[in-house]
């Protein structure tokens, strides 16, 4: 008898496993580093924060915030954090990581096998091609900033089952980890340089992170509207 296990170890959903024990702590009890970056989501008066060095490994976390189901996602290769409603055609859906396309994480829904881009929630292959997941507004800020803005908020804690995996992303926030995929080009406008992306009325534009950090703000016009991009250099809290 011959068994073939080719590529099993390198399948995305085997390399990056879902959370087993999701624990949320009140900000008063949270002992994490105030400088850690988080993705923050607020729904119906309830705010929750998800440290990037945790969800960066899992790539997605399903949660309920303010009575709403939310799928919080993060791609460590392109540094994109997005949140979506995991409801497809009126029914709750679950997803698994299947790989990446154009350096962005790709998910597959469990009901139809369709493939969805993490960067914008667009289905690009399968029976649901062309469908978009409903976006849930989210913000990136430090743990400390979240605590100041949301004193009744909750913060996701490390899952003890993945301590070793989280350790591999310990330098990710600062952009100092050595990796061809997750590493950072510190110069501007290189393949792995940091940018702030803005989408408005169907138009998209990217702004150089280094320039924004030097100036603190950028004023521009997009789709005929004036926009202001500003950053808090202490908390890495960007506002658009």
What do these predicted ranges mean?
Residues 1-240:
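Mid-to-C-terminal functional-domain signal that highlights helix-capping/loop sites
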């Amino acid at each position: 008898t011959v068994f073939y296990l080719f590529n099993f170890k390198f399948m995305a959903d085997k390399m990056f496993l879902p959370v087993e024990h999701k624990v949320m702590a009140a900000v008063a009890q949270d002992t994490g580093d105030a400088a850690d970056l988080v993705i923050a989501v607020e729904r119906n008066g309830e705010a929750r924060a998800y440290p990037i060095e945790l969800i960066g490994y899992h790539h997605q976390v399903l949660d309920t915030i303010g009575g709403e189901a939310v799928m919080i996602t993060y791609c460590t290769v392109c540094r994109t954090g997005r949140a979506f409603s995991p409801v497809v055609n009126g029914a709750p859906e679950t997803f698994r990581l299947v790989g990446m396309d154009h350096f962005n994480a790709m998910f597959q829904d469990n009901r139809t096998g369709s493939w969805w881009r993490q960067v914008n929630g667009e289905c690009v292959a399968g029976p649901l091609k062309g469908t978009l997941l409903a976006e849930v507004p989210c913000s990136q800020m430090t743990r400390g900033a979240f605590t100041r803005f949301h004193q009744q908020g909750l913060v996701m804690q490390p899952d003890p089952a993945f301590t070793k995996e989280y350790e591999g992303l310990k330098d990710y926030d600062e952009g100092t980890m050595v990796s061809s995929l997750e590493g950072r080009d510190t110069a501007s406008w290189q393949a792995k340089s940091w940018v702030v992306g803005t989408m408005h009325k169907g138009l998209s534009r990217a702004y150089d992170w280094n320039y924004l950090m030097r100036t603190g703000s950028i004023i521009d016009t997009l789709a005929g509207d004036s926009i202001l991009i500003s950053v808090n250099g202490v908390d890495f809290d960007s506002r658009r």
